[in-house]
């Protein structure tokens, strides 16, 4: 007769929760970046300056989460740093959604990252680049812009990741 392990009312062991938090800290920013790049490449939705800021925070979270898998002795600290980066992206997304709604004033300058070209090449690139304003919604689902969705998903995920990482029992 086969025996089964006793069913426990407890949630997963702390180590298992930390591994789950680690996985979420990797999957959430990767999925959000995939969605952002997918909408850019296939949907023609080019990012504004604040969209890039949100992406940079997710770019920071991914290597932290990967490093946490490689260094299990430092996992909790690395996962919490990844959660912080995800929360920063969410906070920027919340601010960006507020700019889109007219609640906050947006940035007033635009920047260019072009280097190593002649003045004529730079002018040609500037004129060919799509002009994307931070205060205009390019796409929305149920009245919530992409920046708003990033805020909702990122802040929620950061909270869950932090809770899973810090919960001892």
Predicted stretch roles:
Residues 1-18:
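Short, Lys/Arg-rich, polar N-terminal cytosolic tail immediately upstream
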Residues 45-55, 108-111:
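Non-cytosolic membrane-interface motifs at loop->transmembrane helix junctions
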